[in-house]
Amino acid sequence: MDPRARIEAFLAGYAAAHAEVKPLFDNKEKGTSLAAFDAWREKLREIDVAHRNGEFYRQYALSFGSSPDFSPDTVEIEKIEVYGNMARARLARDSRAYGGPIIEMMLVHVGDDWRIETIDDYDEEPSSPLVDKDVLEAWKAAADKTEPMEAQHKEDMPDPAAVFSASWACEALNEDYFEVFLSDTLEWREEDGDRNDPETYAAVRARAIAEMYRNAEVGPVEIQEIGQFPHGSYLAAGDPFGEMCLCALKVEPGVARAQALLTTLGGERCVAALRVILADREPVQWKHAIVMTASARSTDVSSWHEVDTRSGNGTIADADAYFGMTHRQYSRVGRQVERAFLMDPGSGPIGASTYSGRQYGVAQAYWGLDEDDRPVQLVLDHQELWAPADPPEATTGA
C-alpha cells in the first residue's frame, strides 16, 4: 500500500473495530466489564499487526469513547509529504470525534509496504513552540523581580545531599499522616505536665513525630547516573506531562550532571528525587526553590513554593530549550519514557527526566548553595525519603 491507502485502511479498520466492540460497552445495566476492555485491546492489537510498525495498542487501550477516535467519517487526510523511506501525513479531525483537531502520522517504508510508525494529536500547530519567546521573556522578567528562594519548610527533606550519599534512608511522612496517626502515638507522661499548656503540647507532639520517624519504613538508596545536558541562565522544573515551571533563580550557564535517587518502599521500586549538579563545589546549605507558574500563552505569571507533579514524573531542564520545543518535538520526547533518561527532542539533550515517583500531586524543589551562596545543585524531591537511616538489620537488632 502507498501512504494514503495505508492511512485510509487504518481509519476504516479502527472505526470497524470500534463498532464491533461498542455493544460490550453499551450494556449499562451490568456496567463496563474487564472483558470489554480485553476485547478492545485485542482489536487494537489486530490493528497494529495490520497497519502499524510495532506495538502501539496501549496508546488507546485504556479508554473507549462513544465514537471512534479515528474514522473516515470524522478524520480527513489533508496532505502527505514523502521523504525517501519516511512520510508525514497531516489529518484534520472534526469536533464530533474525541482528540485534538490536528493529527500527524509518520509512516515508514518497510519492504514493499508503508506502515504507520507514530500517531500524534495536537491542539495547536505542531511546529509552534510550547511557549512563545515573548511570553517566556515576560516570565524571566517577573522571575528577576521575585525572591527566588526561601527558608526550607518543616516538611522538606532536611539535607538532600546527605540522602543522596546514604546507603539507607527513612521514608518521609507528610502532615496529613501526622494528623491521622498522631493520636495513637501522642503519649502523655506524668512528668510532661499540663496538657492544656501550648508549649507542653508542642513538646509532646514533637516527641511523637520523632517516634513516628524512628518507626518509619527504611529503604535502600541507589544513585542512577542519567547524563549531562547544557543549560543557560534559567532552569525549568516540574512535570513533563503536566505543569513545568520556570525556576526564579538565575544560574551560571554551563553543563549540568543529572542523577536519579532510587529506593524501594512498600515493596515498590520508585524514583525518590532528581538532582542536577551545576558545579563541583559542595552545598553547605539548602533553600526552598521558588518557581514561576503561568499558562503557556499568558504573561500573567505568579510565584509559588511547590511544584505540581500530578503524573508522578519529574523533569529538570534548560528553560529556553524546554519551553522552546515545538509541540512536535514534545511528542517525540513523550515517547522516551524510561525510569530515568536524558530528554532529547532530536537536537541533543536539554534536560533530565524521571518516571516516576509514587507521590502523585506535589514535589518540592531545593537549591543547594555553596559558601558564597552560589547555586551548585537543584533537587526535585518527590517526598519519598526524609533522612539517612540505619539499615533495617541494625534497627531490629538494637
Regions found by a protein language model. Name each.
Residues 143-398:
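N-terminal domain-onset segments
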Residues 1-62:
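Core segments of small alpha/beta cavity-forming domains
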Residues 76-82, 107, 342, 367-368:
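Short, exposed beta-strand/loop patches in secreted or surface proteins that constitute
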Residues 3, 7, 11, 79-86, ...:
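Low-complexity, intrinsically disordered terminal/linker segments enriched in charged
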Residues 35-98:
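Surface-exposed, charged secondary-structure patches
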Residues 62-66, 103, 107-110, 352-357:
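Short aromatic-glycine motifs in intrinsically disordered, low-complexity regions
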Residues 95, 99-121, 360-385:
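Short, compact, well-ordered microdomains
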Residues 72, 77, 116, 271, ...:
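A broad structural signal for short, well-ordered beta-strand segments within beta-sheet-rich domains
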